[in-house]
Design a protein with these regions (language model features):
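Non-ligating segments of multi-cofactor redox enzymes
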Residues: 15-275, 281-315
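Single conserved hydrophobic/aromatic residue that forms the stacking wall/gate
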Residues: 1-12
Length: 315
């Protein structure tokens, strides 16, 4: 038999196997090594532990450094700044050198890692994944794909345009996303601070109630949907998604090994078929497709150029 014929035979056999066994295999895929990295990074990002006791926000030199993931500046344990909040504050004025730093560091993160940051280095993404592990009926988001474009609207309107246009006398932008939409601000900021600070408890009002409702909706949604905030509303994920295809950290599909069984597409919780678009904007590099692949055709790669050949074998 020719190589093409052998590949087709293997594909047919594995296709049968994947249909019968993939659901069981998905249940056995071990995600805890990645969750371990997520937990470690969340701990490092919020390593100012004394803040949780004193109810005070850390304001040291490290707070001038942006972390790559969505982590609230106002979290009493936060050792670094949230890139979204920092960008909103300075986007309205070029007189702040800090604005160039924020923009540059975001682009650097995106070009180096893309949405690998979402899959490994975002505390709020990890939080949603843990909620999704709660035993309950799970719903697919494949039919809700149009909602993924909402996060780009959030990025454009709430993170760029409104802070750019609505600036104070000092040239500082109003952080619309942080104030009116971000649930991480309630989870990491308002809630822990209010537990130890009576003044903050007394100041909580309608805006807190609104954002608490958003957080509750995200929590409930995360139990049945996989990472709904990441898919539909996160502006930081939207920014990294724009750079996913050109980032140095990419996914590679070896078409000589790929047998088009579809196991990777069925395993992907971000609704991506990696054999068609290895570096899709929604791919968070979680590695589920790699572990589901029966022929080890999918790999991580780091470097210039997209070496993936996405042409899969067809009859």
């Amino acid at each position: 038999l020719s190589r093409r014929q052998r590949q087709m035979c293997i594909r047919d056999r594995i296709s049968v196997w994947s249909v019968l066994e993939l659901d069981n295999k998905k249940m056995k895929i071990n995600e805890w090594p990645r969750h371990g990295i997520q937990a470690l990074w969340a701990a490092l990002t919020n390593s100012h532990v004394s803040g949780f006791v004193t109810g005070k926000i850390y304001t040291g030199k490290l707070k001038n450094v942006c972390v790559p993931g969505l982590n609230c500046y106002s979290c009493p344990g936060a050792a670094g700044a949230c890139p979204v909040g920092a960008f909103q504050a300075v986007v309205g004025s070029s007189k702040f050198r800090f604005s160039y730093y924020i923009t540059g560091i975001l682009i650097l993160f995106g070009v180096l890692l893309g949405r690998f940051i979402c899959g490994f280095l975002c505390p709020f993404g990890w939080f949603q994944e843990l909620l999704h592990k709660i035993p309950s009926p799970k719903l697919s988001t494949k039919k809700l794909k149009p909602l993924r474009y909402l996060k780009y609207a959030v990025l454009l309107v709430m993170v760029v345009l409104l802070p750019l246009l609505a600036v104070n006398e000092l040239g500082m932008g109003d952080p619309f996303f942080c104030k009116y939409l971000c649930p991480q601000g309630v989870l990491e900021g308002a809630l822990p601070l209010s537990l130890t600070n009576a003044g903050i408890r007394a100041a909580l009002g309608k805006l807190f109630t609104w954002k608490a409702c958003i957080l509750l909706a995200v929590i409930m949604g995360s139990v049945v949907f996989y990472r709904p905030f990441c898919k539909w509303l996160c502006p930081l994920g939207a920014f990294y998604a724009l750079l996913n295809k050109v980032s140095l950290f990419q996914m590679r599909v070896d078409t000589h090994k790929c047998v088009s069984c579809g196991a990777c597409a069925r395993a992907c919780k971000m609704d991506v078929d990696i054999t068609k678009t290895p570096n899709h904007a929604e791919c968070i590099r979680c590695g589920m497709c790699m572990k589901a692949c029966p022929t080890d055709a999918i790999q991580y790669k780091f470097g210039l150029g997209d070496q993936s050949n996405t042409e899969t074998t067809k009859e």
